[in-house]
Structures are given as structure tokens and as C-alpha cells.
Amino acid sequence: MDWCVLYGRSKKNNSLINIERATMQTQEKQIVKFMNHKVDPTYIWHTAKDAAVKAVDEYMKDKEEPMYCGFANVKIRPAKGKFVNFLKRQGIGDIAYKGGWRISYYDIMPKSHPWRMTQSMSIKEIGCDAFAEALESFGLDCISESRAD
């Protein structure tokens, strides 16, 4: 059966809807960036770090350490702006592969946290996902990455 008949609309209209949706998301992101332009980078760092710690603590409540080993980090692209300059001055993170600024799970978690030195990829992914989500709420373009060991 033809796609247009099945769903009752043309592919052209559907692609226009997708373009409009993408444009609205881009505009929304620009508004968030504008609103958060004057936010102190220290506040952004601590808010995101607290979100990561809370996510890891909730995930590990009444559990044992998952044994699947790996690495996780958050990549901010492009590697410029107030927040990235703050990270560079503080010695947090380094240059990411294929561009951007990479913040490791070990940089995110406090030194005294019981799950900071874990090898579990699941725990690291949970923390980095929460950290990236918090940064995105401030209008930063970032992704959470992981790889198995």
C-alpha cells in the first residue's frame, strides 16, 4: 500500500512538518542560550555535577556494582564559550577526538564519592547522561559518549 494513502497525508507535507519542528527546536535553543548567557559558569558546573551525583546515587540504591566495564564522558561542541573557558581555566577536561571539549566521568564525580573510581560502564553512563542533560538545559550543545573496555 502507498504510504500517502495509508497515513492520509503526502510525504511533502510530512517533510514540511519536520522542517518546521526542527526550526522551532533551533529557535527554542537559541532563546535558552540567550537567557542563560549571563549565568555564572560555576553555577552551571555545580548544577550539572549535582545532577550527575544524584542520578548515580539513585541508580545504585540497594544494588551491587554492575560488572560491565567501560568508559563514559560528555563532549561539548563547539569547544568555545564562557563555560568551556571556565573548564579550561580550572583544568577540567581536555580536547575531544574529532573536536569539542571532553569531560570525563572522573572529572564529574567528587573525589569522595563512593562510585567515583568504579569500572562499571553502566554507572558512568548514568552519571554522564544526567550531566549532559543538565548542561543542555542551559543551552549547551553536548552529548554523552561511552565505550566498552
Cite the ranges covered by each PLM segment.
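Polybasic, lysine-rich low-complexity intrinsically disordered segments
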Residues: K12-N13
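Acidic, low-complexity, intrinsically disordered interaction modules
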Residues: A96-S112
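Short, compact, well-ordered microdomains
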Residues: K111-D149
